[in-house]
Regions:
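Soluble or luminal CAZymes and related metallo-dependent hydrolases
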Residues: 13, 54, 80, 127-132
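Acidic catalytic loop of the alpha/beta-hydrolase fold
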Residues: 76-80, 105-106
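Short beta-strand/loop motif that positions the catalytic acidic residue
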Residues: 65, 71-73, 77
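Solvent-exposed, polar/charged alpha-helical surfaces in well-ordered, non-transmembrane soluble domains
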Residues: 60-63, 86, 90, 134, ...
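Short, solvent-exposed beta-strand-terminating loops
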Residues: 20-26, 96-110
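Accessory cap/linker subdomain of secreted extracellular hydrolases
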Residues: 1-52, 56-59
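Short alpha-helix in the alpha/beta-hydrolase fold that links the catalytic acid
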Residues: 67, 80-94
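Catalytic active-site module of serine/aspartate enzymes centered on a nucleophile-bearing elbow/loop
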Residues: 103-143
Length: 143
């Protein structure tokens, strides 16, 4: 699961707690038993939504989708590994994929360390990747 992968990289000491919370959510139940550092991920207001989306597999959904799909990911994405984008692409009937060098989760091209990457999430002065914009326009014009 993507969130478990994220936690294993960013806060490995919380991985077992995360797995236990997901086990509870998969059973359709809500829990208030989680460490404070996981509050932003698992607060009580978010859990019903999480229970709902966990019932869906994006690979199965995109496999049934007949309309063209453009899958965009960056090789510097801290949240979604490019292998996830490739799994979607391989599952889709009619798709294109774009993996952008140095691009992160907020579609900004960042060179540097993880801290610089994370800081970019809150920097409105950074521009969306030109390559992403060009590819999106090209993709839409073909529809």
């Amino acid at each position: 699961m993507v969130i478990e992968d994220q936690i294993s990289k960013t806060a490995p000491m919380l991985l077992e707690d995360t797995k236990n919370i997901f086990k509870i959510l998969r059973s359709g139940k809500i829990t208030e038993d989680f460490p404070l550092p996981l509050y932003s991920l698992f607060n009580i207001e978010i859990q019903p939504f999480m229970i709902s989306w966990m019932q869906h597999d994006p690979k199965q959904i995109i496999a049934k989708t007949l309309i063209p799909s453009l899958i965009i990911n960056g090789d510097n994405d801290l949240q979604v590994d490019e292998k996830e984008a490739k799994l979607l692409y391989n599952s889709a009937q009619n798709s294109e994929i774009l993996i952008v060098k140095n691009m992160n989760h907020v579609l900004v091209e960042i060179e540097g360390d993880k801290l610089k990457n994370m800081k970019s999430y809150n920097n409105p002065d950074l521009k969306i990747s030109e390559l992403v914009i060009e590819k999106m326009v090209e993709f839409i014009e073909k529809l």
